[in-house]
Amino acid sequence: MCGIAGFCNFHGNFREDPGKYYQILQTMGRVQKHRGPDGDGVYLQRHVGLSHVRLSILDPEGGAQPMVRQCAGQGGLRGAIVFNGEIYNSPALREELLREGAFFETTCDTEVILQGLLLRGLPFLSSLHGIFSFAFWEDATEQLILVRDRLGVKPLFYATLGQTFLFSSEIKGILSFPDFPAEVDREGLCEIFGLGPAKTYGKGVFKNVHEVLPGHVITLRRIMKDDEYRLSGKVNDSIAFEIGGTLRRRT
């Protein structure tokens, strides 16, 4: 079990005040420290920040996250990932990627995902067998994707605050972001008390905090010139409309 968190905003530059945003990332990780007592790390670029707390299982020395790699092929694409979970067919995928020109620095499954996405792109996701949630950032296209396993074993939540997109393994990571309102959703609370495990999938206690549904992908990218967010993938249409509308109104 590990913990991931982060934020993305295409309208600003987090690197203009790195101390502030490094501290925010560290806080988003620290509130989930029970998920990863063996290590922590952060990654900050102009439009994205990633945080990770780690429970070491595979490659304790080399598997630190966030993990950043540059692909030998595809024009040398560079990407970063924060990952929580286990890929059962990681050894087989590693052999396939080695034949395709990938170079591995560790033995952990995190790097298999990262190299696979850099080499094959999003179609690589269909090759993954396991339990997982992760966030992947690709530098050249300035694209962030959130992915959750088919059974929804590993949790992943997201929200927006103004023009900033937030995500975390646990809701407390989102609530730790400065000025994010911790407002109880009456309907969500009633479902928890009344229906328990039978509640509407993705419905939670806090307003404007959503759950990435099992087997779903959320893609966040900037449209050139218009500077808007584009949401795609298997995301609930009403949620996509709500997020997209909020961000457009604030552009």
What residue ranges belong to the model's regions?
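Cysteine-centered catalytic environments shared across enzyme families
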Residues: 1-251
